A protein has these predicted regions:
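PLP-dependent amino-acid enzyme catalytic core
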Residues: 1-143
Length: 143
């Protein structure tokens, strides 16, 4: 995304990232100016469990304005929002971007926004367990 914005985007285009609190190595790396690693991979957003590397850290450091951290509950609620309103099944890692939007509404108010939503790479059993565990009602099916 950062490279595409830099190459194709306007100079006024801002890139804002999102990460789960449990795997916030990019957030901490930007704050500390050096690559940090995660001590845990306990997140529903399994596509974001990997650690930041030496190749992508400079790209992120130089191309991103900020990273917003979100909770597991915010990720699950974002997935549900997209499922119910758009009828699209998105994976938890993609829901992080939606969670950032809903968490920081004022930051994006009256702005043109692009969000990349991706696939249904989702462990349904794990998601249903988390929905029950966190007392978040499961999405309603329409009959």
């Amino acid at each position: 995304t950062i490279i595409a914005v830099k190459y194709y985007g306007k100079s006024t285009c801002r890139v804002i990232g999102g990460e789960p609190f449990q795997v916030d190595d990019a957030y901490r790396s930007l704050r500390n100016g050096a690559i940090e690693s995660n001590s845990s991979t306990n997140t529903i957003a399994d596509g974001l469990k990997t650690n930041l590397g030496e190749v992508n850290f400079p790209i992120i450091r130089d191309g991103i304005e900020m990273i917003v951290r979100v909770t597991e509950d915010e990720i699950v609620k974002a997935m549900r929002l997209v499922w119910e309103r758009m009828k699209i099944i998105i994976e938890p890692s993609s829901a992080v971007a939606v969670a950032v939007l809903t968490k920081k509404k004022k930051l994006f108010h009256e702005k043109k926004i692009g969000v990349i939503l991706s696939g249904g790479n989702i462990d349904v059993d794990d998601l249903l367990f988390r929905l029950h565990q966190n007392s978040i009602p499961a999405p309603r099916s329409k009959k």
